[in-house]
Structures are given as C-alpha cells and as structure tokens.
C-alpha cells in the first residue's frame, strides 16, 4: 500500500544496451507523478486507488533494432483518463534507401498521430482481471506513409491476416467506442525497372469501431468498422468491415461503395507501375461485397462507368511512347461503358460475381486487391475464365522462355515463375518491434 507519493518537475535519465550492444541514452522531460491511496492485494487480486496524476514530455523509444524511433510529444494521465499527443514513428534513413539498409529489406514506414484520447479507463479491472477496459477511445489526425521497393528481393513467408494480431494480443482488450478522425494513407511502390514510385492514397478518412475487443463472448462475434473517406483525394467512399473476434472463426465481411470518381486520377499509380494510362473514364457508382477467409473469397460487384479508354505505353529514349497496336487491341476488348450504350448492344447492366483463392505470401491489404482485381477486370470486358486462360498462357510462355534462356537471378539460381516479373503488389507489411 502507498498513502501518498509526489514527484514534481523531474528530469529522468537512463541508459540501456541497444543495437550492436551500444549504450543508448533516454530521458523523460518535466515528469510529474502524484499517487494517493494505493492498495494492491495480489492474493485476493484487489486494487484500490484514490487518485493518480502523471505527465511527461518528449519521449523516444527505439524500435526494430534502431531502424525506427517512436517519439511522443506528451503524456497526461489522470485517475481514469489519458491524453497522448504528437506521436511519430520515424526512421533515421531516407525512404528510398531504407530497404537496402534494413537487414531483412523491410518496407519504409512513417506514421504520425496528432492525439490519442482515452476516457473512463477501468484500472481496477486491469489489475484484478488482466482486462484493459476503456469506455471511449478517440484518435485524430493520423498519416500513414509506406514505400515498397520491388528492386530488392525479399524472402517469401506466409503473412497472417491483420486481425490475428488483436486476437493473439497478450492483453485482453474491451473498448466500448473507438473513433478515428482525419486518417490518411499514402502507399508508394517502386517497380523493379522503375525510377518513380506509383502512388495510391486515401484521405479525409473517418472511422468508428463497435465491439472492439478480443474477448470472445458469443458465437459469430465481430468487430465492426464503419468508415468513409476519399480515394486519391477525389472519390467519396463508404465501407463496412466486419472482423472476427474468435480466432476459430476464419471469416470476415466487407461491403463498400464508391461514387463519382474520375478514373484518370489512378494514373499516379498505373503509369509508373503498369505503363498504362487511363485516357478517360468516369465512375458513376461502384459497389461490392465480399465474404472471405484466410484461404479465399467470393465477391459480388457492380461497376457503373462511362467512356473508359486506356493507352499502353513503353519507354523509348527515356520517354513514354504509345504502343499503338496494343492500345488499339486493348480498346477493342474493353467495354467502354456499363451499361453498354444502345449502339453497343443495349442498356443491360453487367454484374460480376467471382471466387478467388488467396495468395498467402502477401499482406491483408494486398489480399483486398486480390479480391477486387478479378471482378474489376471482368466488369470492363474480360471474364474470370478468360483471365485464368490468359494467365496460364503467359505462365507457359514464361516457362519456355526461361528454359531456353536459362533465366537466373543474381545468386545463379533459377527464378520461379512470376518472381521475375513486375507485379502490382499493393500491400502493407507490419513493423516488428
């Protein structure tokens, strides 16, 4: 038990052994701590606290062997609430060089969070039941940036679904309300032969979680995320994502809608990564729903658009040049409108319904792209059957080509099919502490 303890305006400094057994120095600036009426009985697992106040400034914690530093501007804790300001995950290395320097060639990340506010923290239940219960969590002004550099080969490994981290967390969590305000994601990807990364970004996102917990209390229990935002800063979208609480329930659900989007905005992504330029195209409405597991998914999509035209490019003398024959061929195959205009065969809507098998060697974010890609391509004129046939033909020709050329990587080993090609990955990898 502790009757009263007070610490005011303390500067706390400490050292520890960090990367390569080097001595690291840390400090807590302007630290204040006041505790009154603390009583803990470990045998009876009871906890009593009359009052607690804690504040400190300018924290810094190294992560990932020193390749990142987690910086916190300030922490203010009262008896049942806390505010954490100016959170930043930064790397001392430039983003274009990061993956070369990181031992496992991981992706570069940069994360900033304006503020995290926690209200009605139930400290007694944490000490007595080992459950962290919080009535309200507010997160604001979040920016997540990520660069994937395909020029650097990485070892393949099976990537678990994103929600398994919460399911297996060492602490039981039960948050009644979680809201995220003004969240932006900027994803960049540099192709094997590219010089400029392609960019995909989501801005002005707001989200609300209900049932945010990893405590299983009933069958078929889900965390529900309702979100809205803008694709490429232009297309307004809404989405509902249901994530399983129970690790034995290998099933998630996702429904989304996108309204009024200019497809030429995707050229920031497509030009650097796929040498494809959307010349014109306007989305009137896109809706999709998917039921998925860690093994595969089924998806239904309605993609309504007008005047879709594209150009296939190749680099010549350092400049992108129209591959006129292939461009003409592609635009003959493409359905320029959905529904087709009257002269193209009537106004019948084209719906797409397909099933896919997940490639488990990529992240959950990439898996969503795996789910969306087949129905999108089917909607603009190429059925899933034709896509699979084309893939088989390309694989066959790749095998023949590799057989006669003896295609090898830098280590002298044969490259498996699909490994030596530029492919659009669209994925986030987690940062390991």
PLM region spans:
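Extended terminal
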Residues: 244, 257, 272-433
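Outer-membrane beta-barrel and related beta-rich outer-membrane complex signature
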Residues: 147-152, 313-317
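Hydrophobic residues positioned within well-ordered beta-strands of beta-sheet architectures
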Residues: 52, 114, 225-227, 239, ...
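Elongated, acidic membrane-bridging lipid-handling scaffolds
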Residues: 1-80, 123, 146-149, 158-252
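Outer-envelope beta-barrel architecture signal
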Residues: 3, 133-135, 250-252, 295-297
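Extended amphipathic, helix-rich lipid-handling scaffolds
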Residues: 1-14, 32-38, 52-57, 75, ...
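Extended serine/threonine-enriched, polar tracts that run as long, contiguous segments within proteins
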Residues: 229-236, 246-248, 259, 263-265, ...
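Short, T/G/N/S-enriched strand-turn elements that build extracellular solenoid repeat scaffolds
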Residues: 127-129
């Amino acid at each position: 038990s502790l009757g009263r303890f007070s610490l005011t305006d303390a500067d706390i400094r400490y050292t520890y052994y960090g990367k390569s057994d080097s001595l690291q120095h840390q400090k807590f600036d302007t630290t204040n701590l006041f505790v009154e009426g603390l009583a803990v009985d470990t045998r009876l697992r009871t906890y009593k606290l009359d009052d607690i106040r804690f504040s400190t400034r300018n924290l810094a914690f190294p992560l990932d062997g020193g390749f990142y530093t987690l910086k916190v501007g300030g922490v203010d804790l009262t008896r049942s609430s806390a505010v954490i300001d100016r959170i930043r995950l930064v790397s001392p290395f430039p983003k274009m060089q990061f993956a070369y320097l990181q031992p496992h060639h991981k992706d570069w990340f940069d994360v900033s969070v304006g503020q995290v506010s926690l209200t009605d923290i139930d400290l007694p239940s944490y000490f007595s039941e080992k459950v962290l219960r919080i009535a309200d969590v507010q997160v604001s002004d979040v920016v997540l940036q990520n660069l994937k550099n395909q020029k650097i080969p990485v070892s393949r490994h099976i990537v678990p679904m994103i929600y398994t981290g919460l399911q297996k967390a060492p602490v039981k969590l039960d948050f009644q309300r979680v809201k995220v305000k003004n969240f932006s994601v900027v994803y960049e990807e540099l192709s094997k032969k590219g010089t400029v990364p392609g960019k995909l970004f989501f801005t002005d996102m707001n989200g609300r979680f209900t049932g945010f917990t990893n405590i299983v209390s009933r069958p078929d229990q889900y965390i529900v995320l309702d979100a809205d935002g803008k694709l490429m800063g232009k297309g307004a979208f809404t989405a509902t994502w249901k994530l399983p609480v129970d690790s034995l329930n290998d099933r998630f659900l996702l429904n989304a809608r996108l309204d009024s989007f200019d497809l030429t905005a995707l050229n920031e992504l497509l030009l650097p990564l796929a040498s494809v330029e959307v010349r014109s195209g306007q989305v009137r409405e896109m809706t999709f729903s998917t039921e998925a597991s860690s093994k595969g998914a089924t998806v239904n999509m309605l993609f309504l658009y007008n005047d879709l035209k594209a150009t296939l490019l190749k680099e010549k003398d350092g400049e992108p040049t129209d591959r006129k024959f292939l461009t003409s061929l592609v635009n003959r195959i493409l359905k320029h409108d959905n529904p087709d205009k009257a002269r193209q065969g009537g106004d019948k809507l084209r719906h797409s319904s397909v099933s896919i098998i997940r490639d488990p060697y990529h992240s959950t974010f990439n898996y969503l792209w795996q789910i969306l890609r087949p129905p999108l391509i089917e909607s603009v004129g190429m059925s899933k059957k034709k896509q699979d046939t084309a893939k088989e033909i390309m694989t066959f020709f790749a095998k023949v080509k590799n057989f006669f050329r003896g295609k090898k990587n830098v280590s002298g080993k044969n490259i498996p099919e699909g490994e030596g090609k530029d492919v659009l990955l669209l994925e986030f990898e987690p940062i390991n502490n």
